[in-house]
From Swiss-Prot:
Belongs to the enolase family. One of its GO terms (biological process) is glycolytic process. Pathway: Carbohydrate degradation; glycolysis; pyruvate from D-glyceraldehyde 3-phosphate: step 4/5. The lineage of its organism: Bacteria, Pseudomonadati, Thermodesulfobacteriota, Syntrophobacteria, Syntrophobacterales. This is Enolase.
Amino acid sequence: MSEILSVKAREILDSRGNPTVEAEVILDSGYSGTAAVPSGASTGSREALELRDGDPARYLGKGVLQAVQNVNDEIAPKVIGMDGRDQVGLDSFLIELDGTENKGRLGANAILSVSMAAAKAAAAECELPLYRYLGGAMASLLPVPMMNVINGGAHADNNVDIQEFMIVPAGAPTFGEALRMGAETFHNLKKVLKSKGLNTAVGDEGGFAPNLSSNEEAMEVLMQAIEAAGYRPGEDIYIAIDAAASEFYKDGSYHMSAEQSPTKSAEEMIAFYEAWAGRYPLICIEDGMAEGDWGGWQALTRKLGYNVQLVGDDVFVTNTSIIAKGIADGVANSVLIKLNQIGTVTETLQAINMAFKAGYTVVISHRSGETEDTTIADLAVATNAGQIKTGSLSRSERIAKYNQLLRIEEELGASGCYAGMSAFRV
């Protein structure tokens, strides 16, 4: 048994300058692990609850001192002496200690910080990289990156409705080459935008955030950038979008300010996506329908699920009970995985396993409010997920994950493999 010797949490800042929770777990062997929790801007209504202080005089109400106190004063005394290598046992205890459906008493940010830090401490004690500790001997698949190079919606202060436009270098032979292809396309995209007199300031996730004449103009400039970088759209590099449709869904309709026909029914939204899939190498649509539009999701899946990856984020929130219902009802064909949506490492792994068993694909994801923590890079390899979303080719909190994947690829050597097009079952 490897006993937990101490647990300490602190308040740090994320990439948006908002407070978040960082925890450090030390084992009796002297090995330790430190983990920081991310935070989202567009969130599903059924996500595990992120505890904020609500004091307007401090960090505009976004402080996390209560969550930190919950770790230091309530969680720490009760987990000291527990087996640091028993991740399932620790996480089950934390869930029981909280006692709520959404981890709202202690805070999912408090619970997750301890869960992640304990996993890192145990990996260090075993003298294993985190991906090997969590995934075992079979962890060897480097994920295809979905690189968010144009930001809109809740991630940027512009007029673009679609939250993310991503380049997907699925045609690369290795992860390192995929990263290079993405970076070169990103730099060419900046040139394309500048040539059109468009703003090249970046949004929360490091992508450009220009005002555009329409949502489709974003697709057009992406195509130009891919070709300008010397790559073939639909062979070397594909396109993915995160509509985050819940953000513009109201009173049963979708309201898109950048469109000539701004109000759309579910059927019209599906036709909108179908038209794009016909004109562009659109390999993936995330949150194409609102989380509350279950019927719209089913219709979208019936219409496009055979040739486009349809990822559920807000609709599933990494929750196995909701994912199970989606699988049974024919909603989406892929699940986005975010650690802080559910709040423990164990529940995250359970969600991934459920998706894979149902024949769904899995995309490991960051949040718009990130830190230098690289856990999700290891998680992607540990689970052989095959796909990762961790932002653009700028901002160090995004690049940190890419650099960690480069290190993992180097460490795996000939035993590693880049997922490429095999990650997509469409």
